[in-house]
Amino acid sequence: MMFLRDPSAYHGENNKRPFFEGWYHKLVTNDGRALVIIPGIYRSGFNNNQTAFVMIFDGDTGEVFYERFEVQQFSCSTSSYSLHIGSNHFSSQNIILDIESEALTIKGQVTADNLKPWPVTLFEPGCMGWYAYVPTMECFHGILSMDHSLDGEIEFNGSNYDFVGGRGYIEKDWGRNFPENWIWAQSNNFSNSDLSITASLATIPWKNTAFAGFIVGLYHKNNLYRFTTYRNTVTKEIHYDSNKFSWQLRQNDLVLELTIEKGHKAGLLYAPDKMDMGPRVPEYLDGN
């Protein structure tokens, strides 16, 4: 029997191991300054290591700050996205930050309005489609908002980020392990203010083999165009070199051509392995 569950909610009840879950908030000011804020939790299946965390990726400098918390300071609903880590609070509509440590001081509040989530239905419960019902998947993915407006401000290591009139994006990952390899890109800062895109391509273990699974969503004028493996989208062309990724997709009579270029300031985001979270994922906030 299929059971519809909100992808945004916490999936790590009963202290299952190995397990990780992280919510990715991208915040961009009206003049293009970007912060990524990722709260989450990790539990090793190899040892007793476990931690809650808040990760901050500074688009101005490429620096990544990773603050650990005791798991007892982590509290999240299993029916909706409402997360507390210490004195910090996270949801789709609101972020409250209050962290002061040796390396990081960040305080403030940002609210989100007019969110555009990937639709969740019984037969297509979010961006993973029917794959979301396969319990043996190593990693699950959810898109909480393709695009939304922001308000508020954050004081971050002596610098002020004013998010009045800014734009945001929220997604998340959870499961036992990250994919072996993947490419991911997202943007909702175009000259056309009603345009947002997210694209991911990964090697997905499947029984005794693997396949290339992908999720591409294009939001435009209140319509979400879905180019995905489970909708039988076809890759017509694909090319990757050290700086540029080109991809052509066909979904029935729709053709989408993507060209993604690396930026110049890479930050190493922390990601799970068998033992711990570590700086393993290069990401750019200044790509094209």
Go through each PLM region and give its residues.
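Structured soluble/peripheral alpha/beta segments that form catalytic or ligand/cofactor-binding pockets
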Residues: M1-N288
